[in-house]
A protein has these predicted regions:
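Structured catalytic/translocation cores of nucleotide/phosphate-coupled proteins
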Residues: 69, 158-159
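Glycine-rich phosphate-binding loops that contact phosphosugars or nucleotide phosphates
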Residues: 1-104, 108-115
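Internal, active-site/partner-interface "lid" segment
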Residues: 116-158
Length: 159
């Protein structure tokens, strides 16, 4: 999930990193500055290494956004909570419902950030799409969505 969000924010022109490694999470937390933002993603919200990294980042003055269930230790440490509640999975510790809910929240967050950043973000996304088209990604099957609520942008092609 974090890698997906990192890639999306990067395409919008934001500096973002995703760290799964415990030690790199700690270093990333220590490297934060006042005004920095850490987005912590965990459905269960209780992994000690992630909680430690969040504490370190907050100690440096960073704000913490958490994508997690509302009743978790991570939620309690967040400055901004994107609380996600899904029923427990009968088989998996974290089931497909949780995965899809987190992915949907990441998509919504990406759209909101793009809208907030305005035209420069739209231009970056269009350049990325053009790069995909040049290298054989199936762009014709997946038309570019308009960020201004105007529907599908066909780039002058008939849809």
């Amino acid at each position: 999930m974090a890698n997906d969000l990192q890639a999306r924010l990067f395409r919008l022109g934001l500096s973002a990193n995703a760290w799964a490694d415990y030690h790199l999470q700690q270093v990333a937390g220590a490297a934060q500055r006042p005004g920095g933002v850490v987005i912590a993603i965990s459905h269960v919200g209780g992994m000690p290494s992630l909680l430690d990294a969040v504490d370190i980042a907050r100690g440096q003055g960073a704000k913490v956004v958490a994508l997690t269930r509302p009743d978790t230790a991570l939620a309690a440490k967040a400055d901004f909570l994107l609380g996600l509640s899904v029923p427990d999975d009968a088989v998996m510790h974290v089931g497909i419902d949780a995965y899809l809910t987190h992915l949907t929240a990441i998509e919504i967050l990406t759209v909101l950030v793009a809208q907030r950043r305005g035209e420069p973000a739209v231009q970056r996304l269009q350049r990325a799409r053009e790069a995909f088209q040049r290298h054989g990604i199936d762009a014709a099957t997946h038309p570019l969505q308009s960020w201004d609520g105007g529907g599908i942008n066909t780039g002058g092609r008939a849809s």
